[in-house]
From Swiss-Prot:
NCBIfam families referenced in this protein's UniProt entry, alphabetically: HAD-SF-IE
Organism, as annotated: Xenopus laevis (African clawed frog)
Keywords of the record: Cytoplasm, Hydrolase, Magnesium, Metal-binding, Nucleotide metabolism, Nucleotide-binding
Lineage: Eukaryota, Metazoa, Chordata, Craniata, Vertebrata
Catalytic activity field: N(7)-methyl-GMP + H2O = N(7)-methylguanosine + phosphate; CMP + H2O = cytidine + phosphate; a ribonucleoside 5'-phosphate + H2O = a ribonucleoside + phosphate
Name of protein: 7-methylguanosine phosphate-specific 5'-nucleotidase A
Known partners and oligomeric status: Monomer.
Entry superkingdom: Eukaryota
Family: Belongs to the pyrimidine 5'-nucleotidase family.
Active site annotation, chain numbering: 39, 41
EC number, as in UniProt: 3.1.3.91, 3.1.3.5
GO cellular component: cytoplasm
UniProt-annotated binding residues for CMP: 86
Amino acid sequence: MRLPVLGKDTVRMRDPEGLQDKITRIQRGGQEKLQIISDFDMTLSRFSRNGERCPTCYNIIDNSNIISDEGRKKLKCLFDIYYPLEIDPKKSIEEKYPLMVEWWSKAHDLFYEQRIQKDRLAQVVKESQATLRDGYDLFFNSLYQREIPLFIFSAGIGDVLEEIIRQAGVFHPNTKVVSNYMDFDDNGILTGFKGDLIHTYNKNSSVLKDTEYFKEISHRTNILLLGDTLGDLTMADGVSTVENIIKIGFLNDKVEELTEQFLQSYDIVLLRDETLDVVNGILQFVTAKN
């Protein structure tokens, strides 16, 4: 039986029959064996609304009044240089890797110069255009109610990401976030970022020093992985035993050029789909009691 939600016109599948087999196997395993691993920016959050681009965690800071006009220009200049390289279909991940380190490092240096205050972040998020994808409440709340762990692995800013989810009223105890977290001094002024830099193309076990999380849930060998770049495909590398994994890719930009590449790697590719309908549909099916 094919799930009706997979008939949506935004859905592309590499191997519909193989996918259905995986869905059935995950359903048989039950919710006790399931975990979710997801990217945040442009995966759980929207890419656009009414034709306007929605901001990433970094954009929220870049575009806010806690950054000077001069700082904003410099950050925009970095975006204009590096974003096209990040999504360039002709460049390999190996070529993109050092470029992403450059971009993130330069952006962080600009942030330090701005002496960002911790107590202003909540207001900055509130005033931003950041929006979670339609269906986010069902997604976060049903995972919490069913005690299914949600691991968010983000190259964004952890403090901002958490605030977005908190302000939406869906930040629950089953959610664990690994991201770039800001480090503040005793006066609440940004002095740096904690731990290793996480960027688009190193979201793998190399930055997951704290794998205690995956050890604790090692019995959860079925995974739904959600991402929006080819760099997100390695997010489950920290899981020691994987029985079944369904990879769902949100293809938001350069759709025509990247569809084929995405289909080689993701089981399901969602073309310009600003909802979590497909994810929620699969979750409802695999966690149904009968």
